[in-house]
Amino acid sequence: MNKKYLLLFVCGLLLSFTNAMAAVGNGVIKIKTNASKGQKIKMEMFIFGGWDEDGDALDNSPVYGDNFSVDGASNVTAAGNKVVMTADGPEITIHGDVDYLSIVGQGVTYIDVSKATELYELRVNENPITSIDLSNAPRLKVFWASNCKELATVSLENTPKLTGISLQGTQITALDLRNNPNLTSLNVGENQNLSSIDVTKLPALEELWVNGNGMEKLDVSKNTKLERLECSKNNLADLDVANNEKIEFLSCWGNKISGNSMDKLIASLVKETEGTEREFCVYNKLYDKEKNALTVAQAKAVKERGWTPKQATGTMDFFTWQAFDGDDATGINTATISHAADNVWYDLSGRRVAKPTQRGIYIHGGKKVVIR
């Protein structure tokens, strides 16, 4: 082959490569996993296909070798939006304009989406990843990394289009949301190291989960579009929802709200006049750290505002909510009283007393007893 034909051959190869890359797209996603060589990796994805007449993104199913390719893995197959591949090593690189990626429980330890310019939804739940930097994902709208038990840091610096975040059950200690004004759904529950969070810069927020975090304060005064608030299993001694007129579901059981603080919370509930069902899940006797207390009079006040006060029934592993008429002795969790000593009496403060002779309500044999 002379030099002229060799040059033409090389040019042809380069042109073919360039055309192939153009078809695949310019986006790049780099992933590291703890998968051993030969282990299957499963994920779901869609490829950006342009815009429709309404300005919404078009999703195309992935076609290997056509609109996406992979380095670091073999035996790649795609069916619908599901993709399966065999890892050749710990590092996998996906080429293509991926706009939706869900890789759940696949041993992901690292992911780089800084060059995934079309990515709008990322789900990496249940992976041993320790940190995620999304500061170069300006198109991202939805991000889930729930039950990533080792995840400690998340950077959201340049993600102004985010509307949904789920970071339930991680190790994060802080989350800066100042640059995410479009958030409508935020789930940061079951994060024992996240003792506080500022949601005052989230005017569009409609759903908020902060349950099980040990929080002592929660300010939702700026979240005027809030419809659902789950703040159970914290250390809240008070709560004010006066500015949340759209709220329809409030779950605040497992806190320390009682007496005057409960009166103030009830007074802050929007008064329902048009028949909208509004639930006030306030008490869970199955929870051994329950310190909320709702009296009969307070339950009546809740109903007068058009809400339904509710308590949990079932077991802590699986419980449902039922209407609650209040209990003037909700300060005692009878499930924690020993049944072994039938001659032992307690007052409603949980103090052991002699067999009572005065009128009142006492705890005896694990049951509430009224002495008249």
Cite the ranges covered by each PLM segment.
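N-terminal capping/linker segments that flank leucine-rich repeat
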Residues: 2-121, 138, 149, 158-160, ...
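Conserved hydrophobic beta-strand positions in leucine-rich repeat
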Residues: 101, 122-124, 143-145, 154, ...
